[in-house]
Structures are given as structure tokens and as C-alpha cells.
Amino acid sequence: MRPRPAGALRAGAALSPVLLLLLLLQLLGHLWAASTPAPSSLSPGTQQDNQLGAGRVKRGWVWNQFFVVEEYTGTEPLYVGKIHSDSDEGDGTIKYTISGEGAGTIFLIDELTGDIHATERLDREQKTFYTLRAQARDRATNRLLEPESEFIIKVQDINDSEPRFLHGPYIGSVAELSPTGTSVMQVMASDADDPTYGSSARLVYSVLDGEHHFTVDPKTGVIRTAVPDLDRESQERYEVVIQATDMAGQLGGLSGSTTVTIVVTDVNDNPPRFPQKMYQFSIQESAPIGTAVGRVKAEDSDVGENTDMTYHLREESGSGGDAFKVTTDSDTQEAIIVVQKHLDFESQQVHTVVLEALNKFVDPRFADLGTFRDQAIVRVAVTDVDEPPEFRPPSGLLEVQEDAQVGSLVGVVTARDPDAANRPVRYAIDRDSDLEQIFDIDADTGAIVTGKGLDRETAGWHNITVLAMEADNHAQLSRASLRIRILDVNDNPPELATPYEAAVCEDAKPGQLIQTISVVDRDEPQGGHRFYFRLVPEEPSNPHFSLLDIEDNTAAVHTQHVGFNRQEQDVFLLPILVVDSGPPTLSSTGTLTIRICGCDSSGTIQSCNTTAFVMAASLSPGALIALLVCVLILVVLALLILTLRRHHKSHLSSDVDEDMRDNVIKYNDEGGGEQDTEAYDMSALRSLYDFGELKGGDPGGGAASPPQAASSSERHSLPRGPSSPEPDFSVFRDFISRKVALADADLSVPPYDAFQTYAFEGAGSPAASLSSLHSGSTGSEQDFAFLRAWGPRFRPLAALYAGHRGDDEAPAS
């Protein structure tokens, strides 16, 4: 293929200087390509010649790689190049065609000359090259003269795309006071032009706005600080405009820009400062502990955690600053001054403290800027209030003997007015704490006396509340809690711990221990109890039993002689005198009940003469009550069951009376089936019957007359009734025999195993047949009104048949 100049354009085409330069470069490339032979891989005609044989003239393609400039704006199609076959002699017998990307739409070929033109405006940024295939055919026969050859049309780039920043918006940050040259961030632009062709995609960066504070690397786009004194407190945000220019920044290059937001972050370079050097507050002397006196806040120009601070109180000498403490509000960073001791206007009216604020986090890099703390003076004035009287002490313990007479002095309480006026005080007892008014108080002196008799055993302690109020202002009221302990006196005699009962065998030995006795005393002497046991003075000795004081507040009872006879005496009563140690000494008498019982050889009690002893020994009163309750519950359950059963029986009997007129007849006669077949000999079904032998047969073999149906008298039910005599079984046998003979003689009778349905239910029923066929007949003149008299259960049936009959007769009337 012989190349044609690709720059052959019409003279009237108007081109820009840049386009003319590019076309000139393209023309020089084509001239150089024409002087160089095409590679063997791009000459398919050689392969075809080898296939046709050695006697044929060698032919092949002559062609070049084509180029076309993008963004062509001319009005005529742009000449791309020419394809040509060596066999083309210029007589028009060869037809050139192309196929592939853009063939027939973007690229058109002259079939006679092989000239290719571009008809559309191309954009290299959308598609860089097009791959097509060329064919040369005989115009007359459409025979392929050369093998199909592939070629490429490349779109040549021009600088028509400006740089773009694709990853915006850009936001960076840098700490304040950072040194010069500190890297902030990097921005990068992209250019859609061909980076391998010319300088259309070579970019350089520059700062359009903000160059006083920041710089940018021309090649990498890294933004750095230009000054070392960036101060967030002066300016927190900077808007820097960065520009990217292609053609390596040369004249005529295209450019694009973006805005970069740079935020200056805070560092702790500012100490806290109090807006004023003295603060004054006032608080009432009655303020409780924990009351907030006031709030003070030190200002800090920093932000975030750099403003976190703590506060401390430092007391001035003798100023009473220990009455307050300071806490820090973590949300507002305020100092809260709080009362931590009770204030007293009369003792100190003004408190002065030094409040100090300091940062929590101090950056050592800025230690040379000074101390990161500040101080202020805080003065707190205590204001006077009318306070209620004060008890001294506010609570106390009093003691009184339980045998004290009414009006006896228990103790004295004292209260005074803490105010400077020192008004007189009046006293009273809060009756909610002394509902029974056991104690009284003198309103002027505060002396507490007994108002009623005391009993330690009933109430050993009393807690009362005493009120103190100003004489002329009862609203100023204070309270004091008093605990009064009742001291014990020996006013209760000792008693046996329980009503003792003992048992002794008839064959007991002398000196055998029967019972150990202990006592109780409601009193509580300071030195402890000491009890003494002896027999009553009326019977200082007992011939049967002896009493031994063990001297540990218990006593033991022993037998005096050998054996007892319960036939003569089965119960002995032994009175025992118990005396306490006083003072004064008190005593009481208790009785030990001793029962004589029969024992076995091992000494185990077998029986005693009284069941009371057994009950007392084995069952407590609570157990007896529980036993009685159980018995009562069982009796109630039995009565309830009997009542329910009687009620159930009465209900059943009423149902029986109501259904006395209901008669239900059920017929379950269903002959045939497999059971009947198994019960009979099947050979009998195949045997022939001699009708002549049954009745009216001709012994000569004449035709037998058909069997006659039984008369109506034979179908009547047999008479029955209570006065009927004992039936004759021969009558039944004759009746059954006749029925069997008739059935055997009837040719229409089905086999034994056939299913038979008998709708006839016998004569004598007032309602006649209840067959569905018969009862549904409209011709029946049966009157079913009598069904209503049979009770509630037959009323729906009577209404059904009565209504049906009425519907049938309605048209006739």
C-alpha cells in the first residue's frame, strides 16, 4: 500500500496555529513511515501468495498507521489517510471497504481510491484509538483479492483539558505555634490529557490566596506553614486557594484551582485568669453543711481539654477558712464554694479564703510562657438569723428506779437561746413520743418527773422527745432525744420454771433422782440471781422424797425408800419453797406432782393410772387445739359430701320421672354378611329345593303351585300381658317352621348372605311405620298432633310433621 499525505486538506479549511503545527508534525511522521518497509506481520498479502503457488505474481497491502487530531472543528470531513493494494492499477476494478470500530459512522472510505475521512469530532479523553480492518475485493466478482488486514487509527492529543482537583473539598489542620515548614496536608490534581505526549499533563502547583501563611510544593502539592506564629486565639481558620497549571506552567497552559480550609488546632498556651481579684458572698449562719455559697469561674482562652482546671482553697491566717471547701463543676469548669462546717454569726461574721485556679494539663513546651495558675480573694459574710434554742447536750441518758413515786425527779434538761438576745426558753414533752404520759416536765426549769407508776418488767426503756422553744416565739423550736432507763428493784418473787410433773417406778430404789427443779424470776438484780430451795415450813420433811439444793439455782428431788405401791397411792404432791437473794427477799411455793407408774425390768415406764399425765407429757395445748381443728374439718367435709350426693340423687330421680313416657325401640336385625356365610354350609345355597314336598306339590312331577303369602292374621304380634298364661312352645315351633318353608319355597328370596332391609315394624303401633319412605309420603292422613302430649322431647317432631302436613294441604283448600 502506498501512503498518501494525511495532511492533504482543502485550502478553504481554517486551522489554528497549534493545529497547523500538529498537522506538520503528522506529515513528517508519514513521510518517514513511507520510507520504511512495512513489517511482515502487517503484510497479509505475502501469506496469500504462498498459498496460491509460485507461478503467481506476488501482491500485498501497502499501508501506514494513521493518526487523526482530536477536537477537529472544520466543516469538511478530516482526511485521515489512504489504503492501497499493489494490484490496484487505477482502473476502478478494486473495491476498498473497512470494518471495525467507527467504520461507516465515524470513518468513511472511498471505495475507488481507498481514502479514509473522519466525519465526526473526536475526543482522545474518551477514546484514544480505533481498531479497523481493511479489505480489497474485485468489484465485478466481489472476490477477496487480499487477506483482510487490521490497522489502527490513533487520536492525537491536544491540550484541551484543564487540571481538576477531584478529591475536594479539602480540609486540613495544623497546631498553633507550629514551626515554619510544618506539613499541613497534600492536594493533588489530575489532567485528562495524554501524559506521554508533550507537556499537556505536566502540572505545577502554586498558592493564589493565603501565601502569607502557607506555601505549596510546586511538584508534590504538599502545603506547609510559612510562619511560626500561627495563633488560634487570633485566627482559627484559613481559606487557602491552590492552583494547578499544565504545560509545566508555561505560557498558554490551562489551569484549575481549589480552596483548602486549614483549621488551626489549640494547644495549652494560655493560663487561667480570674476576671476579678476579689469576690464577696454572704450566707446565713443556719445554712446546713453542703450548702453552696457561690460560684467563681476563671477564664481560659484555650478550648477543649486545655481549659480543664482545678480549684483549691487556701486559708488566710486566722480567717476561719476551714469552714468551706471547693469543688469543680466538670461541665462548666466553675469553682463551687461549699459549707463544710456549721457557721455561727456570734463567733465569726466574716471568713476570708484564697481561691487558686490551675490547668489540669500543662504542656512543657510552653513552660517558658509563665505559671499556668491564678489566684483570687473570696470573702464570705455570715448573716445572723433567729435560731431556735440549743440543747446542751442535744441528747442524753437518764435513769430512775421502777419503784419511784409519782412526781419523783428523773433528771433536768438544759437549753439556751444562741442569739445575742438570749431570750428565755420554755420546755415541753412531745406527747407523740410519750402517749401514756408517763413523764412530765417543768416548762421553766426543764426538770423531768414521773407522771405515773413505773414497771421495769413491762417497759425497761422509754424514749421521749423534749421540746425547747423561745418564750415569745414558739416557732423557734428545737428537739432533744432522751433515753430513760428504768432501774430494777426486787419486786417479783421467784417461781418454778414450769408446772413440774414427775414419774417414778413402783420398784424405785432409795436415792433415785426423780426431777431437777429450776426457777425463773422477772427481776434482774445487778449481782445476778441466787435462789434457795427448801420444803415448806408446814412439812419440813417428807417420808417419801427428799429435796437437795445444788446451789446453782437448781434443786434435785430423790426417793427416800424402796418401792411404791400405786394401788395404795398413785400420786404424791411435794410443796417446794423458793426464795431469792433480795433485797428484800421474796419467795413463792410451787408443787411437784409425782406419779407412781408400772415399769419393766429395764426401768422403762409402761403405764400409769391416769391418762391426764400421759396427755400432759406428750401433747401440748397447741397440739390439742390442732387435733380438734382437724377433727372439725373432717366432720365438715363428710357433711358436705353427703349433701352433694343427696342433691345428685334427687336430680337423677327428677330426670327419670320426666322421661317415663319416652319409649325408644331399636331394631338391629341386619341379616347377611360374612358372619352368616361362615356360620352356614355354602353347599346348601347350591342345592335345589323340591317345592312339591313343601305344600300342594304334585308327586308325579307336575308343576308346583307357587307358595302363598302368609295371611294377615299370621303377621299380627302375639298377645302379651301380665295375665297371659305360660306360652306353648309348640306354637312357636310351628310358626317358625311355616315361615322357613315359605322362605325356602319362594324363588325371589335372596341367598343367605344377602343384606335385607325390613321396613315393616309390626302392627299395633299408634304411629304406624316410621319408615322414611312412608313418613315422607304426602298422601298420608296420619294425625301427629298426639306427639305433643308425649312431652317436651317430642314437641319439635310434632311441629315438624304438623307443619309439613299443613303445607301439603294448603293448595287443596
From Swiss-Prot:
Gene3D superfamilies: Cadherins, TCF3-CBD (Catenin binding domain). Strongly expressed in the pituitary gland and the brain (in the inner granular and glomerular layers of the olfactory bulb, anterior olfactory nucleus, primary olfactory cortex, Purkinje cell layer of cerebellum, and pineal gland). Low expression in lung and heart. No expression in submandibular gland, thymus, liver, spleen, adrenal, and kidney. One of its GO terms (biological process) is cell morphogenesis. Residues 1-33 form the signal peptide. The keyword Cytoplasm does not apply. Its main location: membrane. Residues 696-726 are annotated as: Disordered. This is Cadherin-22. The lineage of its organism: Eukaryota, Metazoa, Chordata, Craniata, Vertebrata. The gene is Cdh22.
